[in-house]
């Protein structure tokens, strides 16, 4: 009988590559902003953060001090109105609001988006299950 000198690792490497492909295709890669905003949390599992859009998305953020940000750049509400009016109607908008921000500012932005007929609005929230205690 012939003695086996070394273990064949090719099947192990094949399995690991398949697992790597599965993990990379199912993972949700959403880049969050670098702004100091504390995102509200929800209990639901059905958040649509996995729907990463193919088109160029625009991020509008509201800080807890009432400042507005358009794609990570601070902007006045009047300039925000102008920028939003130039967007295409099918542009996806990601709205980030600090959980301590004024609700009035949030409603102003939503009203501005509705006035400009921008329907693809995504509100960024954090799942409570993912929070570390």
Swiss-Prot record:
Pfam families: ExbD. Keywords: Cell inner membrane, Cell membrane, Membrane, Protein transport, Transmembrane, Transmembrane helix, Transport. GO terms for cellular component: plasma membrane. It comes from the Bacteria. GO terms for molecular function: transmembrane transporter activity. It is a single-pass type II membrane protein. The chain crosses the membrane at residues 10-30. Residues 1-9 are cytoplasmic. GO terms for biological process: protein transport. InterPro entries: ExbD. It is found in: Cell inner membrane. Residues 31-133 are periplasmic. Belongs to the ExbD/TolR family. This is Putative biopolymer transport protein ExbD-like 2. The lineage of its organism: Bacteria, Pseudomonadati, Campylobacterota, Epsilonproteobacteria, Campylobacterales.
């Amino acid at each position: 009988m012939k003695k086996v000198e070394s273990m064949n690792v090719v099947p192990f490497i094949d399995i690991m590559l398949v697992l790597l492909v599965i993990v990379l295709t199912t993972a949700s890669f959403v880049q969050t902003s670098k702004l100091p905003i504390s995102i509200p949390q929800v209990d639901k599992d059905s958040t649509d953060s996995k729907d990463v859009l193919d088109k160029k998305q625009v991020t509008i953020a509201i800080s807890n001090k009432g400042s507005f940000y358009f794609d990570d750049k601070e902007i006045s509400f009047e300039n925000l109105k102008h920028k939003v009016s130039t967007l295409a109607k099918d542009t996806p908008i990601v709205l980030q609001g600090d959980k301590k921000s004024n609700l009035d500012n949030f409603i102003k932005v939503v009203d501005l988006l509705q006035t400009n007929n921008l329907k693809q609005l995504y509100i960024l929230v954090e799942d409570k299950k993912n929070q570390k205690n």
